[in-house]
Amino acid sequence: MKIKQILYCMLLACFILPASAQNSWGIVGGGLFSKSLSRDARFSLGGYAGGMYDVHVKNSWYVQPQLLFTYEEFRSKTRLGTDSFFSKFNLELPILASYNVALNNKWNLRINAGPYLSYAMFGRDKSIDYAYGNGMHSSLGWWHQDFPDHFTYGGRAGVSLESEHFIYTIDGKCSLRKRPFGQSGSLSAGVGYKF
């Protein structure tokens, strides 16, 4: 319950911040490689899309809350002959502190870091056991309300290049909460546009 209250407060802060000439809205999207940090896990493709609000704080400092819809996959293949697949569709709320470095009149480099909170809405799980008797055993299912706990939190850091209204980002994130498939990490690259 406490995590839901924190999430509501962070969302409310995104909408009631005062508008100024230095603040701007934007959209972002891109692809990502995600991986569970557990043994025998492999990288898998995913993606994200969403919105952001860039708040100028002081001099070169900014705060950048984002609201993203993400898709992540986690795969593993054990030496005992079991393939596992787990996917999730999330609503993610990163709150990034950002430092702006002007490279020239056209380009700026932004260094971003901060926490994120993620809510897993639904997904799929699949396992194939090749050591099941003389053949294989496969199971495939959807999960949503029966998933034990939907919230995950962690840290996110990266850099972005900005030119006028366009944004090009490279980010990495790592969950601090251990899930049934272990802690997770991802690397992402994306583009965005500020209005």
Residue map of PLM features:
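Bacterial Sec-dependent N-terminal signal peptides
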Residues: 1-28, 191-195
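Compositionally biased, intrinsically disordered low-complexity segments enriched
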Residues: 7-10, 24, 55, 66-68, ...
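Short glycine/proline- and aromatic-enriched beta-strand/turn motifs that initiate or cap beta-hairpins
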Residues: 21-55, 113
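Generic short beta-strand segments
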Residues: 29-33, 69-71, 171-174
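Outer-membrane beta-barrel proteins
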Residues: 36-40, 74-78, 120-126, 179-182
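N-terminal, post-signal-peptide region of Sec/Tat-exported proteins
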Residues: 45-76
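Outer-membrane beta-barrel transmembrane domain signature
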Residues: 47, 55-61, 83-180, 187, ...
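Alpha-helical transmembrane segments and their immediate interhelical/interface regions
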Residues: 70, 74-88
